[in-house]
Amino acid sequence: MQAITLLGSTGSIGTQTLDLVAQYPERFQVVGLTSYSNVALLAEQVRRFRPQMVAIGREELLPELRSLLTGIRPLPELVAGTEGLCQVAAHPAAQRVVTGIVGCAGLLPTLAAIRAGKDIALANKETLVAGGPVVLPLVREYGVNLIPVDSEHSAIFQCLQGVPAGSLRRILLTASGGAFRDWPAEKLDQVTLADALKHPNWVMGRKITIDSATLMNKGLEVIEAHWLFGLDYDHIDILIHPQSIVHSLIELADTSVLAQLGWPDMHLPILYGLSWPERLATPWDPLDLVKLGSLTFKAPDHRKYPCMELAYAAGRRGGTLPAVLNAANEAAVALFLQERIRFLDIPRLLERVCERHQVIADPSLEDILQADAWARRETAQLAQQAPAQVLA
């Protein structure tokens, strides 16, 4: 029986993780849950999974959560705010922490879990994108295991099992191409919010669906792969793979290529993140390659995906610039989801913010957090200015 804490239990990764806990009750026990603001769903999860500690990110919602849990015995310890999230992440009973919080908000709780000696099933790419310079040294210091849950990084992690150190030459991250893979670049100025939220293959949260449409999701994954697997950016490539069956590939020193294949369903990489180093039998339909018939790949169209280029540039520059890019992207996507900016304004805003940032080459945690906050403010201010001056 493995005791887990789930950060971001009411989001897409969180709810799918709990599906698996319910499917394998003899293997997994939930000891901690957190949500930023979805009090009603969090209360339902508490009633079903009976954790020992629960955190709500928005402190003002704690009384409502307490009220919804009236009659629960034993009542879990209830905490709130960033400090509460970190308390749950470091809960003494947990062996593995699943980080399903969206965005840079997952950084501090993940660091708390590492300092408490917990293995991390990492579903929050922003933790490494923004915090790689501080997270990886801490992982090594505390000797914890970092198991990637993103489907692409899980695929690479799986392909590397048993591969001798030093044999990895190149990583090939696959991308569906998002909602606009079949649109000409000239038509992207007509994109609506509804258009951008129509992902062709995956069922995901709203923010990551927009990131898939801009290919920023893949750009952030390039930076994450750099930190996880130690390759420089010249050896991490992106392939458009419309079927989303090959989740990523690795090329070895002798030119052999290994790949991990599966249906586009996050339950599989989440389950591997929970069970590693074991593999659990599942009742799911096996992959039918004969039925699929063919798999296709092509290079990404750089004109359509400027966010991808911004991510490569930020990763190569390093320091605080990836944190700035990530924070600006979170802020810009939030504005787009509120229909306050246009789709093509997202990369324009990101480029302006990155140009204005004074990069700190070897940042501390405080430097990263300050850069994150600055980028969010700068993005909001630029978006309020006249589009002709700022976003054209």
Swiss-Prot record:
EC numbers on record: 1.1.1.267
Pfam families, per the entry: DXP_redisom_C, DXP_reductoisom, DXPR_C
Key word Cytoplasm present: no
Residues binding NADPH: 10-13, 38, 124, 126, 205
Needed co-factor(s): Mg(2+); Mn(2+)
Pathway annotation: Isoprenoid biosynthesis; isopentenyl diphosphate biosynthesis via DXP pathway; isopentenyl diphosphate from 1-deoxy-D-xylulose 5-phosphate: step 1/6
Catalytic activity as recorded in UniProt: 2-C-methyl-D-erythritol 4-phosphate + NADP(+) = 1-deoxy-D-xylulose 5-phosphate + NADPH + H(+)
SUPFAM superfamilies, alphabetized: 1-deoxy-D-xylulose-5-phosphate reductoisomerase, C-terminal domain, Glyceraldehyde-3-phosphate dehydrogenase-like, C-terminal domain, NAD(P)-binding Rossmann-fold domains
UniProtKB keywords: Isoprene biosynthesis, Manganese, Metal-binding, NADP, Oxidoreductase
Binding residues annotated for 1-deoxy-D-xylulose 5-phosphate, in chain numbering: 125, 151-152, 176, 199, 212, 217-218, 221
Entry's Gene Ontology BP terms: isopentenyl diphosphate biosynthetic process, methylerythritol 4-phosphate pathway involved in terpenoid biosynthetic process
Enzyme class: oxidoreductase
Binding positions for Mn(2+) per the UniProt entry: 150, 152, 221
Example GO molecular function: 1-deoxy-D-xylulose-5-phosphate reductoisomerase activity
HAMAP family per the UniProt record, alphabetical: DXP_reductoisom (MF_00183)
Similarity comment: Belongs to the DXR family.
Main function: Catalyzes the NADPH-dependent rearrangement and reduction of 1-deoxy-D-xylulose-5-phosphate (DXP) to 2-C-methyl-D-erythritol 4-phosphate (MEP).
Name of this protein: 1-deoxy-D-xylulose 5-phosphate reductoisomerase
Species assigned in the record: Synechococcus sp. (strain JA-2-3B'a(2-13)) (Cyanobacteria bacterium Yellowstone B-Prime)
